[in-house]
């Protein structure tokens, strides 16, 4: 619950590294958020930064550039490159909502992306621990009903009644 002062560096890698170190030192889980927003940073910078556990693979804000463009890769592709390089980073989806009273495709409305965390107790520590262990999934609409994962099987059921349909 302490304020973490941001790095004062103008160098992207240095600023990201210092910010990640400060977040981790304060007991937090560091995430790289909307890396394609204003094309802020990509694989060549992120591969040089250590200590972050998550990358925002999907951001529901219409200006986040999550999908990339003809010249720049999507955040999913950047994530794939980071995983291929050996980094163990988990993906997140968020809505990045800023607009709550008016709904529209060019507005940053809630519910476009989220994570669903599997916990036995609704507490800050339980949620942080589950996220750190990867006991969550990121979604832009699908809700899971049951997930069974063991040495004999992997079974996934989608809760169709709770799953958002496009344009809902």
PLM features per residue range, with description:
Residues 85-90, 97-168:
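C-terminal functional module detector
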Residues 1-7, 57-60, 117-121:
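Active-site neighborhood of divalent metal-dependent phosphoester/pyrophosphate hydrolases
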Residues 7-108, 145, 149-156:
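Domain-core and long-helix interface of multi-subunit machines
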């Amino acid at each position: 619950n302490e304020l973490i002062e941001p790095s004062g560096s103008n160098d992207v890698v240095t600023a990201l590294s210092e910010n990640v170190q400060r977040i981790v030192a304060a007991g937090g889980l560091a995430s790289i958020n909307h890396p394609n927003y204003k094309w802020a940073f990509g694989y060549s910078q992120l591969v040089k930064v250590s200590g972050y556990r998550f990358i925002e693979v999907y951001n529901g804000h219409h200006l986040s550039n999550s999908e990339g463009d003809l010249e720049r890769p999507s955040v999913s592709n950047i994530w794939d490159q980071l995983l291929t390089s050996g980094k163990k980073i988990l993906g997140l989806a968020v809505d990045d909502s800023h607009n709550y009273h008016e709904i529209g495709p060019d507005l940053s409305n809630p519910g476009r992306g989220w994570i669903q965390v599997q916990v036995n107790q609704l507490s800050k520590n339980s949620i942080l621990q589950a996220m750190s262990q990867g006991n969550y999934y990121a979604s832009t609409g699908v809700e899971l009903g049951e997930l069974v994962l063991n040495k004999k099987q992997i079974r996934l059921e989608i809760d169709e009644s709770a799953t958002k349909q496009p344009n809902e």
